[in-house]
Swiss-Prot record:
Native source organism of the sequence: Oenococcus oeni (strain ATCC BAA-331 / PSU-1)
Record keyword Repressor present: yes
EC numbers on record: 3.4.21.88
Biological-process GO terms, alphabetical: DNA repair; DNA replication; negative regulation of DNA-templated transcription; proteolysis; SOS response
Listed name of the protein: LexA repressor
Assembly and binders: Homodimer.
Length: 212
């Protein structure tokens, strides 16, 4: 475990990075914690790295990054993971999914952290899933997977409509004798029966701007 002097160095690096956007010099660190020898400061920094509290890039001068372990040692909340918002999907009849390079992200909810790295977010258009609280304009967290159990809420892609290009929808999934049933959660809408379907992922969470 790092000594008190080392934690003081770690805290000074953190504060200066937040203040200026880059880490302090070794001399500045020494002055801040009462060490006149730069070699002694280097020794403390090396031990902080050995403890996993910070990381140095040997190819760049003054390139120091405080790790999540280091932030915890300072009592700083960890940076939450982020999930990319990659496009639009319908909660109605299947439409061509609008996909894009992610430029927007949502923080990963704590109850979905176990799926970190396997999630994406889609905006929902339509009202076919309102009985289970997925409304027009909501965003759904989707865990990437290419399979589903009967009754799962999924993002499904089918080529049975339009010009044969893949079209996506959010529905409850059922595999039946000679077809797949994509079941809406809206009493006014009929199920969608298709022969060809690909599962893009399972819906595991919901985001709504008005209440989140």
């Amino acid at each position: 475990m790092a000594e008190t002097k080392q934690l003081g160095i770690l805290r000074f690096i953190y504060e200066k990075q937040n203040e200026k956007g880059y880490p302090p010099t070794v001399r500045e660190i020494g002055e801040a914690v009462g060490l006149s020898s730069t070699s002694t400061v280097h020794g403390h920094i090396d031990r902080l790295e050995k403890h996993g509290l910070l990381h140095k890039d040997p190819t760049k001068p003054r390139a120091i990054e405080i790790t999540e372990k280091g932030l915890r040692a300072l009592g700083v909340p960890e940076t939450p993971g982020k999930v990319p918002i990659i496009g639009l999907v319908t909660a109605g009849m299947p439409i061509l999914a609008v996909e894009q390079a992610a430029t927007e992200f949502l923080p990963i909810p704590s109850d979905l952290e176990r799926f970190d790295g396997d999630l994406f977010v889609l905006r929902v258009s339509g009202t076919s899933m309102i009985n289970i609280g997925i409304l027009d304009g909501d965003m759904v967290f989707v865990r990437k997977q290419d399979y589903a159990d009967n009754g799962d809420i999924v993002v499904a892609m089918t080529t049975d409509f339009g010009n044969g290009e893949g079209e996506a929808t959010v529905k409850r999934f059922f595999k039946e004798s000679n077809h797949y049933r994509l079941q809406p959660e809206n009493d006014t809408m009929a199920p969608i029966i298709v022969k060809n379907v690909s599962i893009l992922g399972k819906v595991v969470g919901l985001y709504r701007n008005s209440i989140y």
